[in-house]
């Protein structure tokens, strides 16, 4: 398979995120904002350290940025600051829904997200889809409709979570030649700066449990930095619509955990809907034109 490493990176990232609720639930007695604060601040510190040890990369990318056209510079800045903003919104709403609504509701958000990402990639990036892929998208929409039919509140929360991440994926698609890890570092640091003014006002009592800080450290490294970098790596050559559909892996893993580990109730309607969504993932990738045509590096497009 062409671009096997990029497919593998995307699959690994979304599988890791599927287990997020397993790590997050032990922190359920902490406010969503507190978890978000410490997660982002911890990630920002680690990313700042990494930038310090990669000053040569920083200098190279600074020279690259100065050599770009005005339009491309604005594109890089939008990826940096817009990406940081969308990530912050996505993280907050996801944590809030997991700890205050249900794990299934958070999983549902990442069933809606692939549909939104695919449609946005088609509308904004003009990514062409085959008839078979549109059929797969329609099948996924029907599955989401079945799941959300009697759960309107869950559906609304899910759309907010999904839209924030779908927009993040779409705006990261174009490759301006910048170092992906450096871009991610800037996004996380910007997210921390966005949250910093709110910390003194909205924070709760300073956590005293050692387990809290160990869990946050684990989340910062293995559930934030690693999967986000894998995601950006995959976006170097895979289309946003392809990444969006592979994102279905996250809610499928989360759904299995919700039923088996958290013992949340499930009915035949949900099983049918999730089965339709699994089938849509298979069909979308089966009808992917990249399986039959040579891949074109995105770095050569738009240059």
Language-model-detected regions and their locations in the chain:
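Alpha-helical transmembrane segments of compact multi-pass small-molecule transporters, enriched
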Residues: 16, 42-46, 109-123, 190-194, ...
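C-terminal-most transmembrane helix of multi-pass membrane proteins
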Residues: 40, 144, 151, 212, ...
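C-terminal transmembrane-helix exit sites in multi-pass transporters
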Residues: 94-96, 112-134, 147, 252-271
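Glycine-/small-residue-enriched transmembrane alpha-helix faces in small-molecule transporters
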Residues: 1-38, 50, 85, 93, ...
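Membrane-interface helix-cap regions at the ends of transmembrane helices
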Residues: 44-72, 139-153, 190-211, 256-266, ...
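Transmembrane alpha-helices of multi-pass small-molecule transport proteins
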Residues: 31-89, 116-117, 164-167, 185-202, ...
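Hydrophobic alpha-helical transmembrane segments of multi-pass membrane transport proteins
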Residues: 11-19, 23, 79-100, 146, ...
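Hydrophobic transmembrane alpha-helices of multi-pass small-molecule transport proteins
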Residues: 47, 120, 124, 129-148, ...
């Amino acid at each position: 398979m062409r671009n096997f490493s990029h497919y593998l990176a995307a699959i690994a990232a979304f599988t890791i995120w599927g287990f997020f609720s397993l790590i997050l639930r032990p922190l359920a007695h902490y406010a969503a904002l507190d978890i978000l604060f410490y997660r982002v601040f911890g990630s920002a510190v680690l990313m700042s350290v990494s930038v310090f040890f990669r000053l040569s990369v920083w200098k190279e990318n600074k020279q690259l940025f100065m050599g770009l056209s005005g339009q491309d510079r604005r594109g890089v800045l939008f990826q940096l600051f817009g990406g940081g903003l969308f990530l912050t919104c996505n993280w907050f709403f996801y944590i809030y829904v997991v700890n205050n609504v249900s794990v299934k509701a958070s999983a549902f958000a990442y069933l809606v997200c692939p549909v939104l990402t695919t449609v946005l990639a088609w509308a904004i990036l003009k990514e062409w889809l085959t008839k078979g892929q549109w059929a797969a998208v329609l099948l996924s929409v029907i599955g989401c409709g079945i799941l959300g039919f009697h759960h309107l509140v869950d559906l609304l929360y899910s759309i907010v979570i999904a839209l924030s991440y779908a927009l993040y994926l779409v705006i990261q698609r174009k490759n301006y030649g910048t170092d992906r890890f450096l871009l991610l570092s800037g996004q996380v640091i910007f997210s921390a700066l966005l949250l910093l003014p709110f910390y003194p006002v909205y924070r709760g009592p300073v956590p005293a449990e050692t387990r809290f800080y160990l869990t946050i450290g684990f989340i910062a490294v293995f559930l934030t930095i690693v999967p986000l970098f894998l995601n950006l790596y995959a976006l170097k050559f895979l289309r946003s619509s392809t990444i969006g559909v592979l994102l279905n892996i996250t809610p499928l893993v989360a759904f299995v955990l919700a039923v088996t580990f958290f013992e949340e109730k499930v009915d035949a309607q949900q099983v049918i809907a999730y089965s339709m969504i699994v089938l849509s993932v298979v069909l979308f990738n089966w009808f992917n034109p990249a399986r039959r045509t040579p891949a074109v590096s995105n770095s050569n497009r738009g240059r």
